[in-house]
Amino acid sequence: MKVEKGKAMNRLVRSALLGVLTLAVLSCEARTDRTDTGGVLLSVSDFDELPIAFSVSSNCEFTSLCFVQVGSLTVRNVILNPNAPNSDLMDVEIKSYQVTYRRLDTGTRVPRPLVEGQFGIVPHGGNMQVDNLVVMGPEQLLNTPLSDLLLVNGGFDKETGSPVIKLELALTFFGKTLSGDDVATEPAKFAISFSS
């Protein structure tokens, strides 16, 4: 009799757990089916004065203050559902940006990523123009592999033997909507050839 009572209790507990689990799954599904009524997307566009070549020796040989800059670019705040109500809480406050590097030649060494603070507000449905954005500084240009291209260091990449290093730069902006949601652009990519 005790065994049957234990089995009945186990069935009751299992049934109750199954009911709670079913309710939880159905609740989650209902939540994920809702439409986003106020999301935004950041994008980078309209590059002007984008450098395609840079001489490390000419610009960095006699100074530690050398930079590669993009003349100007635009960060856009796109409303994902323009038919839904929107507000100033969808404005994005830009906090920082990051540039990462990837070799486009046979080499494997790359500069350290550049991470810098950046301030500005991109209004919902609007743009923010950024002028003279630094995409490489002394930390990238005066260390390997780009420092190999300085004439004082031989003027060629020690890894490949080439006088040119071709890099892809990937630029990402990070920010928050005024309502507190984290937002980032997809990486905007472009290439630069570095020589001695």
Residue ranges of predicted features:
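Sec-dependent bacterial lipoprotein signal peptides
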Residues: 1-26
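Non-catalytic macromolecular-recognition regions in eukaryotic signaling proteins
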Residues: 28-196
